Swiss-Prot record:
Keywords: Kelch repeat, Repeat. InterPro entries: F-box-like_dom_sf, F-box/kelch-repeat_ARATH, F-box_dom, Kelch-typ_b-propeller, Kelch_1. Kelch repeats lie at residues 130-176, 178-223, 226-266. It comes from Arabidopsis thaliana (Mouse-ear cress). Residues 24-70 form the F-box domain. The keyword Repeat applies. It comes from the Eukaryota. This is F-box/kelch-repeat protein At4g39560. SMART domains: FBOX, Kelch.
Length: 266
């Protein structure tokens, strides 16, 4: 005779529904000015988590008043941003560094940025709390457009277009100016590089007397010892020091070409 089999009750589980606790309700009932003063003293690394508390918190975290208060309190803070461009998707994915509540540590958290601009083959560079998205490929066409992501509010605004349409170029910052090199359809000494003055919001060409020996497309670049070092897809390297307006060929093999990790801090 077989042993009796006990009927097991099927245990069902459901996703927990987050409801406001008395403590969180009390916090949300505080005056807006006081909430902003409190949030201004919290690290930006905690903002992605706090934005999940409620729509009110999400709105406060993206408000101009909060960042004005942080500035007055001397609590301005830079954060790490990651942008992923997927060839099959027109819209890029944006992430920012977030502190993990449990266990300790950090994680890249996805952030929602409405009306995000395409970043395929564009030049991304951070200046203060802004990330400039310069040129690139839009429907397989070179572009001269420039847009700016304000990392405080995660909103976009337009900036003056470049003088030349560019694709697969490089962008670097020195002394408050953005230098954009390569990527034009027809490279010559007068259009291989141009510079954007952030204060005056104007573009000007930078004459490159050795443009004929430079690659049209740029693969890697970095600012090293006051000079912009650029490497094309053919491995040809060139360095430009804007402070003394000096160009120099740096050969086909250089430690810059051995591999780099790209980060944006804004």
């Amino acid at each position: 005779m077989s042993s009796p089999v006990k009927k097991m009750k099927k245990k069902t589980t459901t996703s927990p529904i987050l409801s406001p606790t008395p403590h969180s309700t009390q916090i949300l009932s505080l005056p807006v000015d006081l909430l902003i003063s409190i949030l201004a003293r919290v690290s930006r690394l905690d903002y992605p988590i706090l934005s999940l508390v409620s729509k009110s918190f999400r709105s406060l975290i993206a408000s101009p008043e909060l960042y004005e208060t942080r500035s007055l309190l001397g609590r301005t803070e830079s954060c790490l941003y990651l942008c992923l461009g997927i060839p099959s998707d027109f819209n890029p994915r944006w992430f920012t560094l977030c502190r993990k509540p449990k266990p300790s540590g950090h994680v890249m958290a996805a952030i929602s940025i409405p009306n995000s601009r395409p970043v395929h083959c564009s030049g991304l560079v951070a200046v203060g709390s802004d990330i400039y998205n310069i040129g690139g490929s839009i429907i397989n066409e070179h572009s001269s457009s420039v847009s700016i992501l304000d990392c405080r509010y995660h909103t976009w605004r337009d900036a003056p277009n470049m003088l030349v349409e560019r694709n697969s170029h490089a962008a670097n910052v020195i002394d408050g100016k953005i230098y954009v090199a390569g990527g034009s359809r027809d490279s010559n000494s007068s259009n291989w590089m141009e510079v954007f003055d952030i204060k005056t919001q104007t573009w000007e060409p930078v004459l490159n007397p050795i443009a004929d020996g430079c690659d049209r497309r740029i693969r890697k670049s970095a600012v090293i010892e006051e000079a912009i070092c650029l490497f094309g897809y053919k491995g040809v390297g060139v360095a430009y020091n804007p402070r003394i307006d000096k160009w120099e060929a740096i050969g086909e093999v250089n430690y810059l070409d051995l591999g780099w990790v790209w980060l944006l801090v804004a």
